[in-house]
Amino acid sequence: MVGYDPKPDGRNNTKLQVAVAGSVSGLVTRALISPFDVIKIRFQLQHERLSRRDPNAKYHGIFQASRQILQEEGLTAFWKGHIPAQILSIGYGAVQFLSFEMLTELVHRGSVYDAREFSVHFVCGGLAACTATLTVHPVDVLRTRFAAQGEPKVYNTLRHAVGTMYRSEGPQVFYKGLAPTLIAIFPYAGLQFSCYSSLKHLYKWAMPAEGKKNENLQNLLCGSGAGVISKTLTYPLDLFKKRLQVGGFEHARAAFGQVRRYKGLMDCAKQVLQKEGALGFFKGLSPSLLKAALSTGFMFFWYEFFCNVFHCMNRTASQR
């Protein structure tokens, strides 16, 4: 299971093993879902409606956007910003899962609450994600800038991007969009962890005995379900975060349509509602849900997989 397990036969991995499992989980997952992330970011940053009826809209559907990006920018465009994204995923995965395991253990040892309860997983998952976000947010800003830029490129390399952004916008640029990120990530990650745990219990209750034997499939399906639920409920805040992160970067967005400036989170929400309507809060939701299902499913799948590998290694070593 994910989180502290007080049962005597529960996994007893070291903190280093937990961090490594989280890092590898993030690395593999990021490589697989990067194309969906690029499409999602392009949709979120487009001010025009995602519709064929709008002649100014550059993108209006997942398949159309995929074809257009492939034709205009080549296959590698789907992995734009992949290096900062991988740094983000490796660091984020390590800090998030390590924090979650430590927090749930702390709750078990220092309170009367059951570390496996929905509410405990929600709070610990949210706090773990906030800790990870504070650690890697500058890399997230870099990833968004790389994924958002068109042709010709504004930033050629990671080093060039860091230097240019620092000189032109100051050190605070690396924490743009932090407020909506923290506001969004707490309930999102909290729901990921708590829904994953609840769906696993539901799966065990609903499935016949034969179906319970395939634990890897269970982890993948429950993780995917948790990703869809959490992303749907918190999506508008993710859109605000992306819009704010590209502030000061408007010249590189000119090829994609309208460009707007926002004074902050509330101003961003107000402008989106006034100029794009309530549906504007959910631009890019379809590729985002697909990405959330795959990324969360793979995240928990690979994390549980590698934790089990380390557990088997530990047990074998202790028996020698």
Curated annotation (Swiss-Prot):
Where along the sequence do coiled-coil regions lie?
A: none
Q: Where are the Solcar repeats?
A: 13-106, 116-202, 214-309
Q: Does the keyword Mitochondrion apply?
A: yes
Localized where?
Answer: Mitochondrion membrane
Give this protein's Gene Ontology molecular function annotations. antiporter activity; thiamine pyrophosphate transmembrane transporter activity
List cellular component terms (GO): mitochondrial membrane; mitochondrion
Q: Domain of life, per the record?
A: Eukaryota
Q: Which reaction does it catalyse?
A: thiamine phosphate(out) + thiamine diphosphate(in) = thiamine phosphate(in) + thiamine diphosphate(out)
Which keywords does the record carry? Answer: Antiport, Membrane, Mitochondrion, Phosphoprotein, Repeat, Transmembrane, Transmembrane helix, Transport
In the record, biological process GO terms are: thiamine pyrophosphate transmembrane transport
Q: Which residues cross the membrane?
A: 19-39, 87-107, 122-142, 173-193, 220-240, 293-313
Q: Short name of one Pfam family for this protein? A: Mito_carr
Q: Which residues carry this modification: Phosphoserine?
A: S51
Family, as annotated: Belongs to the mitochondrial carrier (TC 2.A.29) family.
Query: Which purpose does this protein serve, as stated in its record?
Result: Mitochondrial transporter mediating uptake of thiamine diphosphate into mitochondria. It is not clear if the antiporter activity is affected by the membrane potential or by the proton electrochemical gradient.
State the name under which the record lists this protein.
Mitochondrial thiamine pyrophosphate carrier
Instruction: State the organism of origin.
Output: Macaca fascicularis
